[in-house]
């Protein structure tokens, strides 16, 4: 007996025979629809918040935000680091800056020559191994909220440090929340009072970092340490119009 279309539905009331799956859905598709419905409900809840948030602009990385970066190289120095220990990079004392290994910011001129508004301050450290073909990583620990009268130890034991970032370079933001830097004439202040430049000018408005560096090597290693301060300077809009020509 061949297939007959008329036999798909029974003529008797209350009984039916479904042959095709046109009106059926898999359980997976049903669960997927439920998940999409939950996502739409969640998006509807966030829409008012997103409308307000879209009115503000923020940077994913504050270092790459608006402004001009001016670098001041404090020193370059070779130091020996014992295994399982970490050495203090600098204690920010005036006597330390007057050593022969520390030149006056490498150059005699302060790079910020005009009156500029300081927006941010970064501590940058670059580490390099002095011997070739050495397979170890650089480790680092730092503290920002130390008491000004606290005397930091020169050497500490490694305990839960973290690895220095890519290219063996690390940046630390020294800005204090709610503290604006009032001075704009940094060059004159630096030239007048170099020995007290940090204690009197910078640290009242920025964090004084205590930075320790070490290695994962099991031997004594000689490393090159380069320390810099990066000033984020506000770039003012030019006085001339941005567009010139017959249409303007």
UniProtKB/Swiss-Prot annotation:
Highest taxon above the source species: Viruses
An annotated Gene Ontology molecular function: structural molecule activity
GO cellular component: viral occlusion body
Keywords: Viral occlusion body
Keyword Ribosomal protein on entry: no
A Pfam family recorded for this sequence: Polyhedrin
The keyword Transport is assigned to this record: no
InterPro entries in the cross-refs: Polyhedrin
Similarity comment: Belongs to the polyhedrin family.
Main function: Component of the virus occlusion bodies, which are large proteinaceous structures, that protect the virus from the outside environment for extended periods until they are ingested by insect larvae.
Protein name in UniProt: Granulin
Species of origin: Choristoneura fumiferana granulovirus
